[in-house]
Amino acid sequence: MVAAPCFRVLRLWTYAHRCDLGHTDPLSRRTEMTTTERPTTMCEAFQRTAVMDPDAVALRTPGGNQTMTWRDYAAQVRRVAAGLAGLGVRRGDTVSLMMANRIEFYPLDVGAQHVGATSFSVYNTLPAEQLTYVFDNAGTKVVICEQQYVDRVRASGVPIEHIVCVDGAPPARSR
């Protein structure tokens, strides 16, 4: 996993596969897991790391102004995954993340992976015309963004099922 420039990921197991919540929930196997078992999915590796050292710092902003422990990171990932599942996001769906560098990006990204969705970061400087191509090409079902980008997302004209703002409710549509 490559961290955004202003965040440093201190430790994350990386494996090529993804999981979905309908498969095996790694936390339910917590007591069975040994340190010699290799996780079989990226999601299982993430949850295993969170269980092994829950109070260790997982994310830290430059200067240490914001930190997130593995315990908090994993809890946020579970909430995000549940929220996305509640919106109807399933394995194979696409979730687009459009925001400035924020610590919230990481639980959103990993939470989408936990429901089997493909998540990707969208440059927040793209004009609506380019967003049209990006969202159409990806088959975006949900866009998670900051309020300041909602008008541009809507101006893309792509029929996004849900726009979720990390900093409040999306502004009402202009008539």
From Swiss-Prot:
Gene3D superfamilies attached to this UniProt entry: N-terminal domain of ligase-like (3.40.50.12780)
Pfam families associated with the record: AMP-binding (PF00501)
Highest taxon of the lineage: Bacteria
PANTHER family on file: LONG-CHAIN-FATTY-ACID--COA LIGASE (PTHR43767), NONRIBOSOMAL PEPTIDE SYNTHASE PES1 (EUROFUNG)-RELATED (PTHR43767:SF1)
Name this polypeptide is given: Uncharacterized protein Rv1549
